[in-house]
């Protein structure tokens, strides 16, 4: 396993050395009723740890609130100093400092730990950060670090480069977390800090954790024309391994998170980071070609984070977007028609959207969800 040493120590004075591959605990395998398949998920976590993964990232809302308790039950069996635990405060659920304190304490109960190695303000944009600061939440969490309950304090961000810079420069953050992959490099998109954001972390020497390196799985399944430049260099490398290597080859990156939901995904990622090879100039050129092709295919930049769920009308928004993106990327109309008509529950289809806007208010990507749902319903119905 490849590790990255940090130049700074944590709040306890301990040296930090994180596995370059981090386990994202948002996409565990699930049972038919939607609950975490705890037997399979625990095996995945134990396999990852045995292979050297030591960074595990969860959050209060993951898996409908069940990720933290499940992770807590698993890590209770491990020596506490053998891993780093990261979780996040959902500021959209905090209207007051007292509400933030209540969630913070509940997280410790769920996780069953005395301290949290990496604590983040979750899914920040400028307005959300400014509100949290005004409520005193940011200052209070620095106090928790001073008290030893948090060892590293940072934030995850879904904002453009200007919003990210506003947040990053405002505090002496121990680290930050950005969505960064070879498709999300252009900071002109509202929710993407992109290359400018990455460069700023280097400039300010703030260690970076990367989330969505495979863009919610999108970059693990490339259409032939997009895969061609990469296959010309290495016909045996998986599409996911290219995406992970691209992210991990940036020198300020300390952890690349991957939400592994199946054994083959974990095995492939462990192989990538067990014998890690930084990207060459030729490989980076091929990645740029692949990205150009993909940008012409994807219908909407949904990562499947499910922050928009549940929909009051029962629409499964990420699943609707997932099948729509498959149509755009792969163009297999027969397969998509079969999936849409025979397998996709009618009660969860986009047609039931009443344009209430609740989803758009919480989408970290700031996607035009309502208009896109209407468009996809028409396209899929007319296959």
Regions found by a protein language model. Name each.
Residues 5, 18-22, 54-55, 82-88, ...:
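Structural preference for beta-strand elements that scaffold enzyme active sites
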């Amino acid at each position: 396993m490849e590790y990255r040493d940090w130049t700074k120590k944590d709040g306890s004075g301990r040296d930090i050395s994180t596995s370059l591959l981090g386990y994202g605990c948002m996409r565990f395998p699930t049972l038919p009723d939607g609950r975490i398949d705890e037997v399979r998920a625990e095996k995945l976590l134990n396999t990852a740890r045995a292979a050297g993964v030591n960074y595990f990232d969860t959050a209060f809302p993951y898996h409908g609130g069940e990720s933290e308790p499940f992770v807590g039950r698993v890590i209770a069996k491990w020596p506490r100093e053998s891993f780093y635990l990261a979780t996040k405060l959902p500021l959209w659920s905090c209207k007051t400092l007292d509400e933030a304190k209540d969630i913070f304490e509940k997280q410790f109960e769920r996780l069953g730990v005395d301290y949290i190695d990496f604590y983040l303000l979750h899914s920040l944009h400028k307005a959300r950060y400014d509100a949290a600061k005004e409520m005193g939440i940011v200052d209070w969490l620095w106090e928790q670090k001073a008290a030893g309950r948090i060892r590293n304090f940072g934030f995850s961000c879904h904002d453009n480069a200007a919003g990210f810079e506003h947040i990053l420069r405002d505090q002496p953050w121990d680290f930050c977390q950005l969505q960064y992959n070879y498709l999300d490099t252009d900071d002109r998109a509202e929710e993407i800090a992109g290359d400018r954001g990455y460069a700023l972390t280097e400039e300010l020497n703030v260690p970076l954790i990367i989330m969505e390196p495979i863009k919610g799985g999108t970059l693990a399944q490339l259409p032939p024309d997009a895969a061609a430049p990469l296959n010309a260099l290495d016909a045996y490398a998986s599409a996911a391994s290219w995406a992970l290597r691209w992210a991990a080859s940036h020198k300020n990156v300390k952890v690349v998170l991957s939400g592994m939901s199946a054994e083959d995904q974990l095995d492939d990622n462990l192989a990538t980071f067990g014998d890690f090879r930084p990207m060459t100039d030729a490989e980076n050129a091929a990645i740029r070609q692949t990205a150009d092709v993909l940008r012409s295919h994807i219908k909407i930049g949904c990562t499947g984070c499910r922050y928009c769920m549940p929909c009051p009308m029962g629409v499964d928004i990420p699943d609707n977007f997932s099948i729509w993106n498959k149509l755009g990327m792969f163009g297999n109309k027969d397969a998509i028609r079969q999936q849409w008509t025979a397998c996709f529950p009618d009660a969860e289809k986009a047609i039931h959207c009443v344009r209430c806007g609740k989803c758009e208010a919480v989408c970290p990507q700031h996607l035009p969800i309502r208009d896109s749902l209407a468009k996809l319903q028409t396209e899929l119905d007319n296959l």
